[in-house]
Swiss-Prot record:
Gene source species: Candida maltosa (Yeast)
Keyword Magnesium: no
Record EC number: 4.1.1.23
Keyword presence, Transferase: no
Transmembrane segments: none
Pathway noted in the entry: Pyrimidine metabolism; UMP biosynthesis via de novo pathway; UMP from orotate: step 2/2
Molecular function per GO: orotidine-5'-phosphate decarboxylase activity
Official protein name in the record: Orotidine 5'-phosphate decarboxylase
GO terms for cellular component: cytosol
InterPro entries per UniProt: Aldolase_TIM (IPR013785), OMPdecase (IPR014732), OMPdecase_AS (IPR018089), OMPdeCOase_dom (IPR001754), RibuloseP-bd_barrel (IPR011060)
Keywords: Decarboxylase, Lyase, Pyrimidine biosynthesis
Length: 266
């Protein structure tokens, strides 16, 4: 059953401080838009985020595709923009290894993801140890609250993430109510009758295009929100093909918010 509760109501009862903060932020900014900023230079990355910042609740990064990455040059100004525009950060790392390995991938190396990203995500393919490893890494490296999304479903054509795989991933999520805050999925993932209130974030959302020729399949904002999506993830629809990120940011923010108001009967 799709939740018709408001973000504020959900914030008041959610066990995760990360989810609480995100719900309050979305309500304050009247925005449930996550900008997926996949570009290869720090300057373009920061410039786009600065333009999109007023319209988003979350920025989604693939930090390892930035050619000139440095912590001081890329992450420090990203955190400044997050404070300036009041949005949270989601590193789309898609962890998929044993617990000890993902712990080090999350906390160490060049990127030190746990030190700056509010939210990250993981596949369920290696079992529940991936959750334990990431949670341990967060607790050992930062005093800031962190949250994890499990990859239950994907938007790409031919994805193997469906059926029993999705069901098993949901079972893994149930093992940690505070650290696992929700899913990357195409619809509501249930759990309400067991006391879970998972945040559903959905990629592959577009107001104009139906696909990209490389397997991506787009669904409309109204379509995904009406079936349980809480946060719409949009990338090239905001800045690709000569689009103006400020114009498109406002357009998608308004579309997402209006769909949320419709779902919650406001």
């Amino acid at each position: 059953m799709v939740s018709t509760k408001t973000y504020t109501t959900r914030a008041s009862t959610h066990p995760s401080p990360v989810a609480q903060r995100l719900f309050h932020l979305m309500d304050t900014k009247k925005a449930n838009l996550c900008a997926s900023v996949d570009v290869q230079t720090t300057s373009e990355f920061l410039s786009l985020i600065d333009k999109l910042g007023p319209y988003i609740c979350l920025v989604k990064t693939h930090i390892d595709i930035i050619d000139d990455f440095s912590y001081e040059g890329t992450i420090v100004p990203l955190l400044e923009l997050a404070r300036k525009h009041n949005f949270m950060i989601f590193e789309d790392r898609k962890f998929a290894d044993i617990g000890n390995t993902v712990k080090h991938q999350y906390t160490s190396g060049v990127y030190k993801i746990s030190s700056w990203s509010d939210i990250t995500n993981a596949h369920g393919v290696t079992g529940a140890g991936v959750v334990d490893g990431l949670k341990q890494g967060a607790l050992e490296t930062t005093k800031e609250p962190r949250g994890l999304l499990m990859l239950a479903e994907l938007s790409s054509k031919g994805s193997l993430a469906y059926g029993e795989y999705t069901e098993k991933t949901v079972e893994i999520a149930k093992l940690d109510k505070e650290f696992v805050i929700g899913f990357i999925a195409q619809r509501d993932m249930g759990g309400h009758d067991e006391g879970f209130d998972w945040i559903v974030m959905t990629p592959g959302v577009g107001l104009d295009d139906k696909g990209d020729g490389l397997g991506q399949q787009y669904r409309t904002v109204d379509e995904v929100v009406s079936t349980g999506t809480d946060v719409i993830i949009v990338g090239r629809g905001l800045f690709g093909k000569g689009r103006d990120p400020e114009v498109e940011g406002k357009r998608y923010r308004d579309a997402g918010w209006n769909a949320y108001l419709k779902r919650t009967g406001q």
